Amino acid sequence: MLANAIGSMASILNQFLGYAGFYLLNAAFEGASALANMLLAEPIVTESQASREKHPLRALPEQFRQLMRDSLHVLRTCPMAVKLIASSALISVPSYLTKMFLQQRLVELGWPTELLFLPLLLGGLACVAGTEIGRRVRCRSMRRLYTACALLCGVGTLLVGTAPAWGGILGMMLVQGVLEVYLLHESQKLNDAIPSDQRATLISVDGMAYSLLMIPASPLVGAVGDAFGQAGAGLALLGGVIVLSGVALLRKKPQES
């Protein structure tokens, strides 16, 4: 997160590197990352993992089907995992959209494009701060934590969509920081709720749920902004939805602590 924040400052080097330079530099970093990933190995946690054999390519389709059956079984028998996955997907929708549409709003408000790295830098620093705060937060109830984080994320999204330039930047920082607090505890609870053998797959499902929500959310937010002639209009609507999701939990009787 800190590297991404600092990397956002690379926009000021645009006049020296150009698009080709940035792509080549990115390719070099990705290549180094791929080499590092090749050194990773799965830790052996359970006996079934220790006795696992390598399968030929022709067996992969059946292995995939079995993996899907096992994952669906875990989701059916663990409602908590489903709730956690759904909550993280919904509350994470503003994460990318606030950063992207804030840049459009800043340009509309007269900001020079050379300074658009600044909100991305501050957003990355807010993520770092949110992670540090999150590990100090004692979560006794995911329901209450979601309610608090949804209200704060919703307010932050509303600020990005409606406030002046610095108010929008502060709103985006609020969204990024609060999300790190919630997602830190959500991932811990999800890890505890699912078996080790299905953990990697279901964590991927966690990310996939967010991607599926972004498919309609991103064009919808943009379409609302185009309809009203303001980039922030769609964000204001999105912020209201996130706030309502938190308010809705306030009216529900707690079922878990």
Language-model-derived ranges and their functions:
Residues M80-I85, Y146, G168-I169:
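Hydrophobic alpha-helix/TM-entry signal in multi-pass membrane transporters
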